[in-house]
Amino acid sequence: MATAVGMNIQLLLEAADYLERREREAEHGYASMLPYSKDRDAFKRRNKPKKNSTSSRSTHNEMEKNRRAHLRLCLEKLKGLVPLGPESSRHTTLSLLTKAKLHIKKLEDCDRKAVHQIDQLQREQRHLKRRLEKLGAERTRMDSVGSVVSSERSDSDREELDVDVDVDVDVDVEGTDYLNGDLGWSSSVSDSDERGSMQSLGSDEGYSSATVKRAKLQDGHKAGLGL
């Protein structure tokens, strides 16, 4: 009787201690597990159902078989990803994993080199872009200077062309006067030549008609004489 009362008092003390801890933990914002109790542990062991050892063993065997099948599938996939060489069928699991580890390191090195090369190319691209912008600004400035020079040159060429046209007009006028004089002299000479030709032609025609008349008179005289 005294023993039972003592156990009940001990349980009450543990419960009170637990409640105080929970209140303190609630104030500080964290919680803890229940204090260990032999009676509660014994109660759980008594109420724990007994499992069948045969069914547990079969379940374990089935899980192990599935795990091995999954492992074989993963190893086959790994063989397709890792370069193994001509004797790939003779490789053990350990050698396959070793080669896979080396291949992963090689890929990581290639990845680091690629990242470094990309950074270098990006820096070069930025440098070329700045240089292109600078050249574009210089080209715009040169185009503006060239347009100013071209406009000035066109103005000077236009002035020189006006001067040349004035000189050519003066020369052409003088040449026309000289040509008119030549044409007048040649026309007078041609007129005199034409008049001389007409006179000579008329004299020739008169001479010819007189000769014909004289021949006809001689023929008539001979006929009258009976010759």
UniProtKB/Swiss-Prot annotation:
Comp. bias intervals (Basic and acidic residues): 216-227
SUPFAM superfamilies to which the protein is assigned, alphabetical: HLH, helix-loop-helix DNA-binding domain
Positions of the bHLH domain: 55-107
GO cellular component terms, semicolon-separated: Mad-Max complex
Short motif Nuclear localization signal, span: 21-48
Amino acid composition bias (Polar residues), ranges on this chain: 198-211
Molecular functions (GO terms): DNA binding; protein dimerization activity
GO biological process, one term: negative regulation of transcription by RNA polymerase II
Keyword Nucleus among record annotations: yes
SMART domains, A to Z: HLH
Matches recorded under InterPro entries: bHLH_dom, HLH_DNA-bd_sf, MXD1_bHLHzip
Keywords: DNA-binding, Nucleus, Repressor, Transcription, Transcription regulation, Ubl conjugation
Pfam families: HLH
Region span, Disordered: 30-66, 142-161, 184-227
Compartment list: Nucleus
UniProt modification remark: Ubiquitinated by BIRC2/c-IAP1, leading to its subsequent degradation by the proteasome.
Subunit text: Heterodimer with MAX; the interaction is required for DNA-binding. DNA binding requires dimerization with another bHLH protein; does not form homodimers, and does not bind to DNA in the absence of MAX in vitro. Interacts with RNF17.
PANTHER family xref list: MAX DIMERIZATION PROTEIN 1, MAX DIMERIZATION, MAD
Purpose of the protein: Component of a transcriptional repressor complex together with MAX. In complex with MAX binds to the core DNA sequence 5'-CAC[GA]TG-3'. Antagonizes MYC transcriptional activity by competing with MYC for MAX binding. Binds to the TERT promoter and represses telomerase expression, possibly by interfering with MYC binding.
Protein's name according to its UniProt entry: Max dimerization protein 1
